[in-house]
């Protein structure tokens, strides 16, 4: 798929997995979409599975953004305590788009926790609380 086609899908609000080898244009396409969202004042969470990847996109780790840290599971009490944290509550409830770069470095358990957190904060049974989710990465580039 060409970058223009991917960008059209992103602008249409579709959930998208961008993949390709190094230099394929994943980051370029993400940055174009991020600029598009920011110009329209759409709240976007720019995250990555690693700190280095997050800083390259002026974002933060998905673990920090979602408030999951290094946890493997979250109880109802954990979620209630998380909702009491003003900063976490505001950005999780306001987010309309979630971008996760270097998805291949994120364990499925952590992705499930992000889903659990967003469903709780958005008070929705939809996947990821119903927000648009864009993941990018190359599963052939595993450690």
Regions found by a protein language model. Give the residues of each.
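Conserved ATP-binding/catalytic motifs of P-loop helicase motor domains
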Residues: 1-143
């Amino acid at each position: 798929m060409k970058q223009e086609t991917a960008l059209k899908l992103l602008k249409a609000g579709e959930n998208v997995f961008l993949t390709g080898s190094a230099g394929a244009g994943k980051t370029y396409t993400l940055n174009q979409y991020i600029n598009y969202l920011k110009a329209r004042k759409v709240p976007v969470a720019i995250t990555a599975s690693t700190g280095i990847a997050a800083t390259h996109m002026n974002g933060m780790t998905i673990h920090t953004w979602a408030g999951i840290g290094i946890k493997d599971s979250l109880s109802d009490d954990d979620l209630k305590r998380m909702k009491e944290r003003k900063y976490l509550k505001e950005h999780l409830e306001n987010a309309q788009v979630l971008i996760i770069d270097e998805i291949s470095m994120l364990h499925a358990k952590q992705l499930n926790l992000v889903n659990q957190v967003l469903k709780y904060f958005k008070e929705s049974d939809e996947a990821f609380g119903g927000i648009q989710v864009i993941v990018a990465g190359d599963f052939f580039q595993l450690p």
